[in-house]
Amino acid sequence: MSVLVIVSLWLAAGVHAMGSGSKSEEGASAMILHKQDSGREVQVKSGDVIQVELDGAGGTGYWWYATGLDAARAELVSEETKAPSDKKLLGGPTRGIWRFKAKEPGKTDLTMKYYRVWEGPEKAVDQFSVMLNIR
């Protein structure tokens, strides 16, 4: 049990360090983007981590999915979900956290669509999109 707590605290400290704009383990910068950043063009360096945090409604079937990502320019390296507050309500709000790593220099569109997987992206009810300009 104590090992689990120590590992959890260690992981939480690592996530906090990434979110603060510091260097990640590999020495890459981390940038955090939220829904209000949609429509922006962001400048990043090859190797940088782009963290996208989007809220969803748990229990509705809707979720955020990356669509059309240019795998030569950026890759999804991790995905996690958490309750946006200390109150863990069944079917309540959920925050998704995705970490993408910038790869080859150039521009690529990072788009996340909010839809029910059985309905497909063409039935998306919301969208988040940023243009990554990788140097």
Task: Indicate residue ranges for each PLM-predicted region.
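Interdomain boundary/hinge segments at the C-termini of tandem beta-sandwich modules
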Residues: 132-134
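N-terminal edge beta-strand
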Residues: 23-52, 57
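Bacterial N-terminal signal peptides
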Residues: 2-13
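Short acidic/polar inter-strand loop motif in beta-rich domains
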Residues: 115-122
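Aromatic sugar-binding surface patches on proteins
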Residues: 90-97
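Short, solvent-exposed loop/linker segments at beta-strand-coil boundaries, enriched for Pro/Gly
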Residues: 60-61, 68-86
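Glycine-centered tight-turn and secondary-structure capping sites
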Residues: 100-108
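Boundary at the C-terminal end of the N-terminal hydrophobic targeting segment
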Residues: 15-19
